[in-house]
């Protein structure tokens, strides 16, 4: 009799995706982040579900309901802080995952890469709407400022913003619809993640050398299941240290003040994982130009495969491109720091220079360095 694992229509799919999947024998810990993102997503859906049982999406009671969760619900504070810091872990894993794709040339799997970009946008939208729900000062003003950016779109901008708000300002209608979208989007993300995996399994995984590994494959289980569990334990340890020792480390103190439309906080800023894009937005004096730069800072990932000039796939054997890649990482960290600073003299200039460098590295320097390395190898 055939093993049920290989014959049952449903279990067979799981088997081919997670058990008998042929995987390259040399993939490093950088390939852990896909499974970690899956765990993050499940964790966020579960904690979010329990939070939604106690949350009320009304401007008068939203802030109080979050306080009620933290004070009165059994272990509500753990659930709330796991959800808030879980989002941070989600984005850390996302950035590492995308960085891995950039470094090792995984973007040559075009369908997988493009679904990944779509996933990144969807996760960012979900996180933004989730930040609005506690209805603190930063929630309200963050929602006002970021949604207001759409008014820069010519002709339809103002109508579009009022349509999203459901009125003439961010109010009850906005909060209710944001809660509805925040609840449904993670399930859409789950579906997209399944498609992402489907496309990946059409081609098989890339590996650090960038060389085709069809001749040297090993089963995913037990080798990579054990390896992924190590990464999972490290991530859960970091998450729980954050949750149990300094749950507000990555949050904004202003969000412990209930939303007040009559009082603007001195410095409006989003969560840390959006700061790099926020810095790029602020470094352009023109509103429409800033919005375009903001969108392009992520959309630029879609043209990375078209700008690949090197004869080699990954950067493992390309020291010049490696230097450029780590310069890009340093630049993104600089942008993240600048996004959290007030808009005044040294920070404005640093932000503008870092923004120019960001686009220059991806659009100009990386293709040039790829060509130079091709020439060097000919000698």
Curated annotation (Swiss-Prot):
* Gene Ontology BP terms: mitochondrial electron transport, ubiquinol to cytochrome c
| Membrane-spanning segments | 33-53, 77-98, 113-133, 178-198, 226-246, 288-308, 320-340, 347-367
The record, for InterPro entries, names: Cyt_b/b6_C, Cyt_b/b6_C_sf, Cyt_b/b6_N, Cytb/b6-like_sf, Cytochrome_b, Cytochrome_b_C_euk/bac, Cytochrome_b_N_euk/bac, Di-haem_cyt_TM
Q: Where does heme b b562 bind?
A: 83, 182
Its needed co-factors are: heme b
Which residues are connected by disulfide bridges in this protein? none
What Pfam family does this protein match (any one)?
Cytochrome_B
Q: How does it sit in the membrane?
A: Multi-pass membrane protein
Residue positions binding heme b b566:
97, 196
Q: Where in the cell is it found?
A: Mitochondrion inner membrane
- What's the record's note on cofactor binding? Binds 2 heme b groups non-covalently.
> Which Gene Ontology terms of cellular component type are present?
mitochondrial inner membrane; respiratory chain complex III
Please tell me where this protein is predominantly located: mitochondrion
UniProt key word Heme: yes
Looking up Gene3D superfamilies in the UniProt record yields: Cytochrome Bc1 Complex, Chain C
**Keywords carried by this UniProt record:** Electron transport, Heme, Iron, Membrane, Metal-binding, Mitochondrion, Mitochondrion inner membrane, Respiratory chain, Transmembrane, Transmembrane helix, Transport, Ubiquinone
| Residue positions binding a ubiquinone | 201
What else does the entry mention about this protein?
A: Heme 1 (or BL or b562) is low-potential and absorbs at about 562 nm, and heme 2 (or BH or b566) is high-potential and absorbs at about 566 nm.
Of which family is this protein a member?
Answer: Belongs to the cytochrome b family.
Q: What does this protein do?
A: Component of the ubiquinol-cytochrome c reductase complex (complex III or cytochrome b-c1 complex) that is part of the mitochondrial respiratory chain. The b-c1 complex mediates electron transfer from ubiquinol to cytochrome c. Contributes to the generation of a proton gradient across the mitochondrial membrane that is then used for ATP synthesis.
Describe its partners and assembly state. Answer: The cytochrome bc1 complex contains 11 subunits: 3 respiratory subunits (MT-CYB, CYC1 and UQCRFS1), 2 core proteins (UQCRC1 and UQCRC2) and 6 low-molecular weight proteins (UQCRH/QCR6, UQCRB/QCR7, UQCRQ/QCR8, UQCR10/QCR9, UQCR11/QCR10 and a cleavage product of UQCRFS1). This cytochrome bc1 complex then forms a dimer.
The name on file for this protein is Cytochrome b
Organism of this sequence: Herpestes edwardsi (Indian gray mongoose)
Q: What lineage is this protein's organism placed in?
A: Eukaryota, Metazoa, Chordata, Craniata, Vertebrata
């Amino acid at each position: 009799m055939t093993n049920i694992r290989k014959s049952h229509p449903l279990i067979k799919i799981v088997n081919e995706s997670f058990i008998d999947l042929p995987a390259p024998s040399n993939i490093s810990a950088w390939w852990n982040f896909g499974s970690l993102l899956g765990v993050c997503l499940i964790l966020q859906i579960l904690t979010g579900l329990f939070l939604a049982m106690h949350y009320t999406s009304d401007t008068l009671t939203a802030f109080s309901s979050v306080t009620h969760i933290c004070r009165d619900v059994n272990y509500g504070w753990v659930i709330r802080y796991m959800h808030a810091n879980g989002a941070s872990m989600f984005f850390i894993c996302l950035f590492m995952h995308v960085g891995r794709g950039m470094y090792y040339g995984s973007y040559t799997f075009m369908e997988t890469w493009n679904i990944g970009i779509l996933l990144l946008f969807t996760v960012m939208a979900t996180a933004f709407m989730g930040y609005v729900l506690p209805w603190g000062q930063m929630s309200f003003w963050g929602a006002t400022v970021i949604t207001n950016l759409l008014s820069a779109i010519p002709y339809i901008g103002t109508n579009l913003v009022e349509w999203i708000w459901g009125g003439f300002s961010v109010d009850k209608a906005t909060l209710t619809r944001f809660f509805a979208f925040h609840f449904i989007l993670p399930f859409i993300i789950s579906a997209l993640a399944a498609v992402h995996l489907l496309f990946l399994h059409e081609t098989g995984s890339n590996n650090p050398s960038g060389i085709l590994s069809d001749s040297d494959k090993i089963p995913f289980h037990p080798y990579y299941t054990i390896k992924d569990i190590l990464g999972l334990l490290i991530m859960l340890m970091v998450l729980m240290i954050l949750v149990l020792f300094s749950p507000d480390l990555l949050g904004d103190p202003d969000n412990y003040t209930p939303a007040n439309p009559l009082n603007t906080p001195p410095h409006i800023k989003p969560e840390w994982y959006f700061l790099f894009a926020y810095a790029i937005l602020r470094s352009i004096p023109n509103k429409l130009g800033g919005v375009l730069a903001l969108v392009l800072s992520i959309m630029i990932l879609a043209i990375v495969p078209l700008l690949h000039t090197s004869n080699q796939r990954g950067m493992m054997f390309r020291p010049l491109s490696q230097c450029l890649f780590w310069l890009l990482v340093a630049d993104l960290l600089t942008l993240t720091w600048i996004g959290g600073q007030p808009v005044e003299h040294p920070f404005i200039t640093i932000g503008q220079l870092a923004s120019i460098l960001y686009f220059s590295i991806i659009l100009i320097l990386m293709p040039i360095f790829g060509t130079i390395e091709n020439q060097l190898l000919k000698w």
